[in-house]
């Protein structure tokens, strides 16, 4: 009788032994359905010698209930899961949940109903129907896709279906993924960039090689590591690019498409369930050649991974703060070690840990010291607010206001940065001096005027702003102290009423779509 040791996705359980039914082929990494009492749980078969447990007699073992028809989790990824669980003190089951984040992805192929023109003309041909038929000649897609392409409503197309002008066609929902072309639009690199690109590309296919790509802002780091991705594609391997924020995904996808002719597979928390399913299956099958994503993309089951790139490797947002609390930058290096592939850490401000690794000889360093096309670094000036203070009740220095005004006169844009979300960092009572503190952690409550609430940026507690002071009961005595981005935006709107302004924080830009809309508005 054959036994299988299984790690279920229930963190409260340890490894469990099951009997493998006749005819079921289970190997380490196989994704199985394991019975537990009246329930059935997803689990992953594991090497028995790596996960010791109490031996159970063969006669007491329950048979596995099923085997999921997806590729097994490869040994390098299993070793990474073990390392992550051990290093970050997390249950192995919790780590495996990041490998198998979508139960829908484990289901079989689905069918999708699409529509295409039949060639017949409906008896009643309205201008909208005529417009749709002209635009859809030779095309096929869902009602939503065809309506968007033709510039008409869904109802117009459904009317054409009822009239026999469009026919339904059942197709596989898992459409083929586009394959990036490494030679689609090679960039013109300067001598330093060519040397750096050659160094990175030569590392692909030659084993574990962590590289710190250290380049000043605007030096072309992205174009350089794109050449390493191109070499990875030429060798028929998969590449992974990690970004610190999902808001950066859409702009990056456009740059990637301009270089390789199509967009890569995206992976982040804002994807719809159907998109996550398609992306996961494409990655697991090896069909997805390049994946761009946030932290969680690191644990996906790439069967033929050849390169990992961590863009903006200095960013603290690579640290996962809930669930399994891991650092994606360091964990990516470990995945590169287990996969025996190069890992590129791209940054303009290298973390101290990475520089130390270079000093110790554990990382290789590739430097880009000059900006692309001879561009100069910006002129930086510090304004002494004790010598040039803003007027009472204002926060922008007069010299800064003058420079913004000159920028507007030239038709140029201005970016103002302040590391404080909301309207004001502190709310207090003018009558008794009471300061609003979080009841959970005693941090100050930050006023968010756009969302009409007070919020704690430490623990997440929120409350509506009261009309009276809770300490002394005085009404209309509450005052906001200090500036947040919303307050600065109000001041800018007062000073420059004809200028178009936007607030960019995690409160207003919470998805790649919103980020893309903002970037589009800036570029318009």
Spans of features found by a protein language model:
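Inter-lobe coupling/hinge region of RecA-like P-loop helicase motors
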Residues: 181, 377-399, 504-506, 514
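Conserved helicase ATPase core of P-loop NTP-dependent helicases/translocases
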Residues: 272-284, 500-505, 509-524
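Conserved interdomain hinge at the start of the Helicase C-terminal
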Residues: 229-230, 388-417
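Accessory, non-ATPase domains that flank or precede helicase/AAA+ motor cores in DNA-metabolism machines
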Residues: 1-347, 354, 359-375, 409, ...
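Conserved RecA-like helicase motor-core motifs
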Residues: 240, 260-271, 439-440, 446-449, ...
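Cys/His-rich short segments
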Residues: 400, 409-494
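Accessory helical-bundle/CTD segments and flexible terminal tails appended to RecA-like ATPase motors
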Residues: 97-124, 381, 386, 434-437, ...
